[in-house]
């Protein structure tokens, strides 16, 4: 079996030296771990001999006098049982799921763990059961040269189980193959019992999580040094405000709301409460693919996730508001005596946004898009306020409106002058520039007025003439009389129609 020294995630056997997974037994008694469980609970003391004072035991001496110590030892069995059903991956050591179990669920977990111990040939160590069945058993190698490794076979299994707890990559494929030939029937019973224990643990834990119960008391919480996450992967200690940075991968990591533990019970309570709201779904049965995520840096789920967006849609008007404003704006504009072009010009001069008369017209008719209506409404509202405040006194709006109204006065031509222009048009519909100048001087009109009158007269003639008939002048009619051929109709018919 693999040892902690061969694990790539634990260089220099620093994890075992940190003492985060196992707890030191100050008494140093050989059967101390087994006596606290009651009913085959002492896993690390299976070697038979007494452990050294520096060796590690699964259960800590601080829990022996406490009635909850039975649950702690049962949680050790649950750890091995759930690890066997999870393909060799241990979830955590005495995590809050098992410590928060009711006594009935804990008793069921102990019974299932006892069945696992009786049926499994590797029942010498509760932690050793976490070994993957995919690897055949090997003779225990010599103990590593660490300062705290002094045990025998039980210690080797303990190191092996701890090392397998940190190994990677995870098993995401089909279920593990049948057990080794040397151990017939051992892992089949273990898997069945582990499945029952896992179901009991989940059934007991999920209602308590959904009910929003208080986190377990301080005596049921393990104090864990900084730098370790729930998965057992190494990570940077969470900084101030880092909160859950060890999860790293978010939903891709096997971090359940009830599994996160911090340095103090207050921090653990914070994680328990916050992750319950941030990730209400049950944990995924597999680890995430890829290397372990190193936390540190930003907290996985900060309080900003549940905070409400301060930006609201209160400032955005509704369609009814826009319709009501457009109606009022049109009434006020007409009452003040401004045209739509005046408003567009005033907006461009006052606020820097030039709008045409067409845009103002479409706004009043509610023919603009909702987005453009919302953009134009505050500008028109400001213009209305400015116009209302300046009523009765000439202000900049009146000056701008006066500039917008600048257009040439319509020219009125007398009847006698119009008759002279008509007679000249019948003679020559397209006078030259010199003829226009002479005619303007004789009629005492501007040259531009005469030119525009002839242009308008030609357009009027085109509208009055059907499109299929070519307009003919009297000169053209008389010129066609001398060129009549034998197969053409008599010219007097065309002449009579032209004259009439």
UniProtKB/Swiss-Prot annotation:
Basic residues bias locations: 270-287
Any one GO molecular-function label of the UniProt entry: HMG box domain binding
Compositional bias per record (Polar residues), positions renumbered to this chain: 468-486
Residue ranges with Pro residues bias: 134-146, 171-181
Main location group: nucleus
Tissue note: Brain.
Record field: compositional bias (Gly residues): 32-52, 241-251, 293-303
Record InterPro entries: HD, Homeobox_CS, Homeodomain-like_sf, Lambda_DNA-bd_dom_sf, POU, POU_dom, POU_domain_TF, TF_POU_3
UniProt subcellular location: Nucleus
Assigned GO CC terms: chromatin; nucleoplasm; nucleus
Outcome, altering residue 362 to L: In SNIBFIS; no effect on nuclear location; decreased transcriptional activation function; no effect on homodimerization
Positions of region (Disordered): 32-63, 122-190, 231-319, 461-500
Domain POU-specific as annotated: residue spans: 314-388
DNA-binding region ranges: 406-465
Any GO BP: positive regulation of transcription by RNA polymerase II
Keywords: Developmental protein, Disease variant, DNA-binding, Homeobox, Intellectual disability, Neurogenesis, Nucleus, Transcription, Transcription regulation
Keyword Transcription: yes
One Pfam match: Pou
Family of this protein: Belongs to the POU transcription factor family. Class-3 subfamily.
Associated clinical condition: Snijders Blok-Fisher syndrome: An autosomal dominant neurodevelopmental disorder characterized by global developmental delay, hypotonia, intellectual disability, autistic features, impairments in speech and language skills, and dysmorphic features including abnormal, cupped, or prominent ears and ocular anomalies.
PANTHER family linked: POU DOMAIN, POU DOMAIN, CLASS 3, TRANSCRIPTION FACTOR 3
Functional description taken from the UniProt entry: Transcription factor that acts synergistically with SOX11 and SOX4. Plays a role in neuronal development. Is implicated in an enhancer activity at the embryonic met-mesencephalic junction; the enhancer element contains the octamer motif (5'-ATTTGCAT-3').
Subunit structure: Homodimer.
Protein name as catalogued: POU domain, class 3, transcription factor 3
Organism: Homo sapiens
Encoding gene, per UniProt annotation: POU3F3
